[in-house]
């Protein structure tokens, strides 16, 4: 097997050179991180679950006309994607108060928000991904006003789709984080959904019990992360050829 050229490695994924120009292979790792990677562990099977869940969601989004970087699945851990220029701003959509919003504004966790709220965060681990305004984004040239409009419109479409998808399987979509990129097609440039959508970047609560089914289980030392992610996959109807072996986190020194 020929050795692939590594293009980029992040906290949870590795990007390799793809088979065709303008493509990449996105590989999902078993690494779990929280608090800007100050907390780390390796959780066996997490990468497989995130890959399969994200692949499922991106496929459905493509089908309803939401532009994404996803092309097709390759194997249990990898997918073929289009190469995009990542816009350095994370987009967070909140439906229910939780996490930093609850702390920042003193709103009880679990409070349903009057409407879905969109927030922007500058992607920079050293600065702890600070929250920024549209003014910051345009002033520093991270994105144009039109690109911001596109990201917000796509984020709300994704929110509508995911809210219905998860509600149908007994899961409440509390909030989620997405990233967007610029896809260059000849002289045309368009904003598309990139990165992933998985329990790593969504807050998912069981509608009946309010049990957390996302990465908060790792952040808050609750345990049972693989079991929770597996339950999300099962409810989505994703079948595994070989279900990931359940194991506890292995702390990385």
Curated annotation (Swiss-Prot):
Give its E.C. classification number. 6.3.2.6
Main enzyme class: ligase
Instruction: Specify one Pfam family.
Output: SAICAR_synt
Which family does the entry's similarity section mention?
Belongs to the SAICAR synthetase family.
Q: Name one GO cellular component term.
A: cytosol
Q: Name one GO biological process term.
A: cobalamin biosynthetic process
Q: What is the taxonomic lineage of the source species?
A: Bacteria, Pseudomonadati, Pseudomonadota, Alphaproteobacteria, Hyphomicrobiales
- Pathway in which this enzyme or protein is active: Purine metabolism; IMP biosynthesis via de novo pathway; 5-amino-1-(5-phospho-D-ribosyl)imidazole-4-carboxamide from 5-amino-1-(5-phospho-D-ribosyl)imidazole-4-carboxylate: step 1/2
Out of the domains of life, which is the source?
A: Bacteria
Keyword ATP-binding included in the entry's annotation:
yes
Q: Which reaction does it catalyse?
A: 5-amino-1-(5-phospho-D-ribosyl)imidazole-4-carboxylate + L-aspartate + ATP = (2S)-2-[5-amino-1-(5-phospho-beta-D-ribosyl)imidazole-4-carboxamido]succinate + ADP + phosphate + 2 H(+)
Molecular function via GO: ATP binding; phosphoribosylaminoimidazolesuccinocarboxamide synthase activity
Query: Which keywords does UniProt give here?
Result: ATP-binding, Ligase, Nucleotide-binding, Purine biosynthesis
Identification of the protein by name: Phosphoribosylaminoimidazole-succinocarboxamide synthase
Organism of origin is: Parvibaculum lavamentivorans (strain DS-1 / DSM 13023 / NCIMB 13966)
